């Protein structure tokens, strides 16, 4: 029995080290411009917080590998419109409920440029980059799409493409959850890239009808996490190989999307979408990430009260916890 226990212990230690080694090569940028406090709805914070918790606790990305650029960053001024237009609140900087600030950077053009420059200096051809964008996009007077950053700054698709072009990485996966997301695809697609969009170029993206999140990206994050914001399990591993690929997450989100929008996905090479997951490229890395202990989240006073799989979200300007 001792021998068996020893083998199991060493196996768990190996799997934990392997998972850490894989996640060491994944980096993420979460961008939510907000535009202004009149336009920065609570659900955008919820979208980002759910994904942040998923990347940290389900995908095991190191905290320092996740860069958050959201509305006015850690400025304590009110920057977020409460649900039902019931006044304004300041976006919480703690996205995972551990009592420590996670958000520091405002979603400005300068901060985004500096972030991409820093990543260019850090990342290598053995690394993978994930970029997630929610909030507002629009079309200008000439019909061209633009992304709204904080304080009414605009970012054109070609400008975002120019920021990404110097990167020398193994692959880049991009998820765009904003309106007119499809208009960004011609600028962002390319070799070694996956681009997922919540809607077509001429469409709006929509909020969930029954929860304070955006519809497509909510279901996409559920697929990656393999549970919803309350911790209820979802089945997104279509081929039951232990990985959630970008294709599987996209398919799951499409099936569960209830709004009048047309999600899209493009990948070069095409099979990259089936291979790419936060556990590595699945036909290169053959082992599965194994974790027997779920991380514990904390309340705002640092007390260990609930699992990270239970939903921390904002409604009416107040942090709330959905218990199973």
Residue ranges and their predicted role:
Residues 312-324:
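C-terminal tail/sorting-segment detector
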Residues 16-127, 279:
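Boundary/activation segment at the start of structured domains
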Residues 7-16:
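Bacterial N-terminal signal peptides
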Residues 86, 90-107, 122-124, 134-167:
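A short, glycine/acidic-enriched catalytic loop
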Residues 33-42, 97-106, 145-151, 206-210, ...:
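Second-shell loop/turn segments in exported
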Residues 34-38, 72-76, 135-141, 153-154, ...:
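Solvent-exposed loop/turn segments at secondary-structure junctions
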